A protein has these predicted regions:
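Beta-propeller domains with acidic blade repeats across secreted/periplasmic ectodomains
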Residues: 1-272
Length: 272
């Protein structure tokens, strides 16, 4: 069944994939992790899942997951894995940091250019062997992966941006933004080219406890909200567990989602 869901995605057939963890937040001595990705299907198209199956197993706290054209990408512990649609498992990259299970690679998101972006917090250090050499990220930052060639670019190392990033989003112009679990939103685009000169990105808006971000643009939303940010706020009570912040950060709209305070929101996504 579904236990401690960490990530949810849908494929083009409407199937839901849920990354779950029984051992979160850490493994007990002598225990072999067997976390799973559960696939839920609506066979009779009534809007409710009527079939549940294990798509992937043998995982260790899968904090990152994203559906691609050729299968599902899963980040767990120190490894980035790929599962084809038959569930066959392939190790793509290893060497990601696992010093803190709350800050391991997370918040997988596709860019408009077909790159896979994901975050890591400042409690881990990564040294990943790639076909292009070692890709290192020693503190909080963002990774950009080109899956076809396994080129992995580390961005925002050495506290250039958020200390605990948990979400990346793109607007209609392809600009990138990152959300901080202990801060606000940072404009990520200026740091999209790896550089040796370390300049800290300015923070957009007020600091807070945020997790998950999306840029609004769905046609079923008011036109004046286009380009605004939808973010999760996990610090306060359930009366303030999602916010819509406009582009100029002048107005904040509080959404009531009626979520249990024991569950933190990880990713915000508006379905078009």
């Amino acid at each position: 069944g579904i236990a401690n869901p960490l990530s949810v995605r849908w494929d083009a057939r409407g199937r839901m994939f849920v990354a779950c963890s029984d051992v979160y937040p850490q493994i007990e001595p002598g225990v072999m992790p067997d976390d799973k990705v559960i696939m839920l299907e609506d066979k009779n198209t009534d809007g409710y899942a009527d079939k549940s199956s294990v798509f992937a197993s043998g995982l260790n706290i899968p904090t990152g997951m994203e559906v691609g054209i050729d299968g599902v990408y899963v980040g767990h512990n120190t490894e980035l894995l790929h599962f084809d649609w038959n569930g066959n498992r392939k190790l793509l990259l290893s060497g990601f940091g696992n010093g803190d299970s709350h800050q391991t690679m997370n918040s997988f998101a596709w860019s408009p250019g077909g790159e896979l972006w994901f975050c890591q917090g400042d409690g881990v250090e990564s040294r990943v062997e790639t076909p292009f050499g070692v890709s290192s990220l020693f503190q909080a930052g963002v990774y950009r992966l080109r899956p076809d060639e396994l080129k992995l670019d580390p961005l925002l190392d050495d506290f250039m941006g958020p200390g605990n990033p948990w979400g990346v989003a793109f607007d209609d112009y392809g600009q990138s933004f990152v959300i901080d679990g202990a801060g606000g939103v940072s404009y990520l685009t200026p740091a999209s080219i790896p550089a040796k000169r370390r300049l800290r990105l300015p923070r957009i808006g007020k600091p807070g406890g945020y997790c998950g971000i999306d840029c609004l643009g769905a046609s079923n939303l008011p036109a004046e909200m286009a380009g605004d940010f939808l973010i999760g706020d996990y610090i306060f009570d359930c009366k303030k567990n999602a916010l819509i912040i406009n582009k100029e950060f002048q107005n904040i709209y509080i959404l009531q989602l009626n979520l249990n305070k024991e569950y933190e929101q990880i990713r915000k996504k508006i379905l078009h």
